[in-house]
Amino acid sequence: MRLLFAGTPDVAVPTLTALVADPRHEVAAVLTRPDAAVGRHRTPRPCPVAKAAEELGIPAIKATSVKSGEGHDAITSLDADVAVVVAYGGLIPADLLAVPRHGWINLHFSLLPRWRGAAPIQRAIMAGDEETGACVFQLVESLDAGPVYRTMTVPIGPMTTAGELLDELAHTATPLVIEALEDIEAGVEPTPQSVEGVTIAPQIHPDDVRVTVTAAAQEIDNLVRGVSPTPGAWAELDGKRFKILRTRCLEAGDGVPSTVATAQPGQLVATRKQLFLGTGSQPLELLQVQAFGKRAMSGADWARGADIDAGTRLR
């Protein structure tokens, strides 16, 4: 089939590459975001999908919006059978949804209807979900509410971060798109989503990623993993922010000094090789932290430089 591919970040590139490699399909064009100005000299830099499209010899439609103008016209004149979306990051207006013969399909990284929205992986980990996955569904006007063609489920490990899980799904979920296109060619109808169990996964706001030291250790650990590596959970010590990048919840049988076991919420306790944070439930080990503008380092190394003592508390 003749395809339009819409995507922007690294996570979308494996699907684009797989579609180009499939002789049954022709990727006629890529829809992506305009080049971003980066660095001191504000040099334009293409996004990962635009760069991949250039390397693959595929024309790119770079548009801030496709509600009207050249981007809109380019899509309507493409004569596509299907448009495939993976992390495009822009809205598709209602009039364009019907332009491809078989509409638009989207690879979404959650088990719909759970976690509709822009940050499904992050929100799943932050909520403490034990599993998530990916699905391919038909785009409709309502947010991530269209019927589903294909679904896969993956466990969320106790140490898994959002970045690691997203990278995994970017590759393992790609076959779902190929299978969904096979379904479309075969005339298979997608399955409507359940009206029950709908949750929303809004973009991560800076206030969402501040560590609340009175929260339970598991809740803080979920937050840290859910927003790692970016934007990163943060806390404040002596008026200065620092990121907490890796944590570990203590397990039964972990031997810790009494000063660690009795740490109060917000209290930092450093041993020779470890750093712990008192929480609303039990101590949490801080495995990796990063002062703003500095490199990431182990919690113990950071504690030595920060001169942590028995009275040190986070705000």
From Swiss-Prot:
Source domain of life is: Bacteria
> Which reaction(s) does its UniProt entry say it catalyses?
L-methionyl-tRNA(fMet) + (6R)-10-formyltetrahydrofolate = N-formyl-L-methionyl-tRNA(fMet) + (6S)-5,6,7,8-tetrahydrofolate + H(+)
**Top EC category:** transferase
Q: Which CDD domains match?
A: FMT_core_Met-tRNA-FMT_N, Met_tRNA_FMT_C
Entry EC number(s):
2.1.2.9
Cite the binding residues for (6S)-5,6,7,8-tetrahydrofolate: S110, L111, L112, P113
UniProt keyword list: Protein biosynthesis, Transferase
* SUPFAM superfamilies noted in UniProt: FMT C-terminal domain-like, Formyltransferase
What is one cellular component GO term in this UniProt entry? cytosol
GO molecular function (one):
methionyl-tRNA formyltransferase activity
Question: Short name of one Pfam family for this protein?
Answer: Formyl_trans_C
Q: What is this protein for, i.e. what is its function?
A: Attaches a formyl group to the free amino group of methionyl-tRNA(fMet). The formyl group appears to play a dual role in the initiator identity of N-formylmethionyl-tRNA by promoting its recognition by IF2 and preventing the misappropriation of this tRNA by the elongation apparatus.
NCBIfam families membership: fmt (TIGR00460)
Tell me the protein family, please: Belongs to the Fmt family.
Q: What is this protein called?
A: Methionyl-tRNA formyltransferase
| Originating species | Cutibacterium acnes (strain DSM 16379 / KPA171202)
Q: Gene behind this chain?
A: fmt
